[in-house]
Curated annotation (Swiss-Prot):
<dbReference type="InterPro" id="IPR036805">
    <property type="entry name" value="Tscrpt_elong_fac_GreA/B_N_sf"/>
</dbReference>
<dbReference type="GO" id="GO:0003677">
    <property type="term" value="F:DNA binding"/>
</dbReference>
<dbReference type="InterPro" id="IPR001437">
    <property type="entry name" value="Tscrpt_elong_fac_GreA/B_C"/>
</dbReference>
<comment type="similarity">
    <text>Belongs to the GreA/GreB family.</text>
</comment>
<keyword id="KW-0805">Transcription regulation</keyword>
<comment type="function">
    <text>Necessary for efficient RNA polymerase transcription elongation past template-encoded arresting sites. The arresting sites in DNA have the property of trapping a certain fraction of elongating RNA polymerases that pass through, resulting in locked ternary complexes. Cleavage of the nascent transcript by cleavage factors such as GreA or GreB allows the resumption of elongation from the new 3'terminus. GreA releases sequences of 2 to 3 nucleotides.</text>
</comment>
<dbReference type="InterPro" id="IPR018151">
    <property type="entry name" value="TF_GreA/GreB_CS"/>
</dbReference>
<keyword id="KW-0238">DNA-binding</keyword>
<dbReference type="InterPro" id="IPR036953">
    <property type="entry name" value="GreA/GreB_C_sf"/>
</dbReference>
<dbReference type="GO" id="GO:0070063">
    <property type="term" value="F:RNA polymerase binding"/>
</dbReference>
<dbReference type="Pfam" id="PF01272">
    <property type="entry name" value="GreA_GreB"/>
</dbReference>
<dbReference type="InterPro" id="IPR023459">
    <property type="entry name" value="Tscrpt_elong_fac_GreA/B_fam"/>
</dbReference>
<dbReference type="GO" id="GO:0006354">
    <property type="term" value="P:DNA-templated transcription elongation"/>
</dbReference>
<dbReference type="InterPro" id="IPR022691">
    <property type="entry name" value="Tscrpt_elong_fac_GreA/B_N"/>
</dbReference>
<dbReference type="GO" id="GO:0032784">
    <property type="term" value="P:regulation of DNA-templated transcription elongation"/>
</dbReference>
<protein>
    <recommendedName>
        <fullName>Transcription elongation factor GreA</fullName>
    </recommendedName>
</protein>
<dbReference type="InterPro" id="IPR028624">
    <property type="entry name" value="Tscrpt_elong_fac_GreA/B"/>
</dbReference>
Amino acid sequence: MSKTPLTVAGANKLKAELQKLKSEDRPRVIAAIAEAREHGDLKENAEYHAAREQQGFIEGRIKEIEAKLSNAQIIDVTTLNAGGKVVFGATVDLSDEETGKEVTYQIVGDDEADIKEGKISVNSPIARALIGKEEGDVVTVKAPGGDKDYEIVAVKYI
């Protein structure tokens, strides 16, 4: 199985969530289950069933994060030297050929993608069109809404 690329920031975010789940959320739910058990009959105890359900979600998320981290190839973007080419982790300034509007995207792993923060998945149509290109190149992005042309204004590794 191939490793999944992940930036250092993305890995740190997952590690922080994992730490919170293990040190805060898990003990809180265990205490809630113990308290609900003291209320007697478990068959008709809604608090108990809700706490057990929440425990299942927390344990599932812990396993999911641990699996992601164990299968991750953590890439420090600041140490990249790709010679100006667009690669995973690069921050790319683009100019829309039609409107002249400029946008900035960082190419990140699937789990880190957040368009509001300007982070796009390495598997997105825009990122796939950009990978391997350089400053000054014009790329055509094939998107569901039609083709769009962008000029690569700058490539940074920050």
